[in-house]
Curated annotation (Swiss-Prot):
Organism: Lactococcus lactis subsp. lactis (strain IL1403) (Streptococcus lactis)
Top class in the EC scheme: transferase
UniProt KW keywords: Antibiotic resistance, ATP-binding, Kinase, Nucleotide-binding, Transferase
Similarity comment: family membership: Belongs to the aminoglycoside phosphotransferase family.
Highest taxon in the source lineage: Bacteria
Single Gene Ontology MF annotation: kanamycin kinase activity
Protein name, as recorded: Probable aminoglycoside 3'-phosphotransferase
Length: 262
């Protein structure tokens, strides 16, 4: 864990149920978002402890348990919530994400593998999923962010949208295209899929997972290839490997416009 910052913590500030896991362990800051702190606990096979505002990790706990049931990841050990904070303790999935040099050094294979794993996820049965209305939740977040002028046009560079107003108008005209017919990761990016020598091991960071529109994952799959590899040249290859017959360009553009306000 040499690339992570080691932390000194006061165990007494954590819920008593976590003390045994935290005791005598090296703790590292593995956070990647301002919304939550993630601690890596270097003990046994490794644990991750996610800490965020009260009730904000409930959905991730539900979907983490569901993905374990579907053999798509490991479940959580404990989910604790009080008036001010949530704590979600999870086991580390053994392996590395797509950002490991083994994968980044072979971008064509990475692209194809990323698409194949997404198609595998999207073909799963979802009848007993606890989150069946991701599209409605997604659009609600868009409306909230639009109302406070929280926007970023970088997400529509490929879609000939030049202004915030154009993006919002497109959403208003096309939002009924979004479906709830596919099990999603919701944040399908290279850091969130764990592999062992190219073999799929599991999905992590499932706070946006649920049943929604496949084009959300397709959008983020194409985006992460550009962002993490540094070129957009694998975009078409990714869509081809996933299956062009299952891609609606209007819904893909709609998701891009939604992410302007994401």
């Amino acid at each position: 864990m040499t690339n992570l910052k080691e932390l000194r913590i006061n165990i007494e500030k954590f819920p008593e149920a976590l003390h045994n896991t935290l005791k005598d362990a090296k703790i590292y800051d593995s956070s990647s978002s301002p919304e939550a702190q993630v601690l890596f606990i270097d003990k046994k096979d490794g644990y991750y402890l996610k800490i965020a505002s009260s009730k904000t990790l409930e959905r991730e706990a539900e979907m983490t348990a569901y993905f374990q049931k579907k053999k798509l990841g490991l479940g959580y050990i404990s989910y604790l919530s009080d008036q001010s904070q949530d704590f979600l303790l999870k086991k580390k999935i053994q392996g590395e994400n797509y950002l490991a040099k083994q994968y980044l050094n072979n971008p064509k294979r990475l692209c194809d593998n990323l698409a194949e794993n997404l198609r595998f996820l999207h073909e799963q049965n979802f009848e007993d999923c606890p989150i069946l209305d991701h599209s409605e939740r997604y659009l609600k977040k868009v409306e909230k962010n639009a109302s406070i002028n929280n926007s970023n046009l970088d997400f529509v560079n490929n879609y000939n949208i030049r202004t915030i107003e154009e993006a919002y108008d497109y959403i208003e005209n096309k939002k009924l295209l979004l479906r709830n017919d596919t099990l999603l990761h919701g944040d399908y990016c290279l850091p969130n899929i764990i592999l062992d020598n190219w073999k799929f091991k599991g999905f992590i960071d499932l706070d946006c997972a649920g049943v929604g529109d496949r084009h959300i994952d397709l959008f983020w799959g194409a985006w992460t290839l550009n962002f993490n590899i540094g070129t957009d040249q694998y975009r078409d290859r990714f869509f081809d490997a996933y299956g062009r017959d299952r891609i609606d360009v209007d819904r893909l553009k709609l998701v891009g416009c939604c992410e302007v306000f994401g």
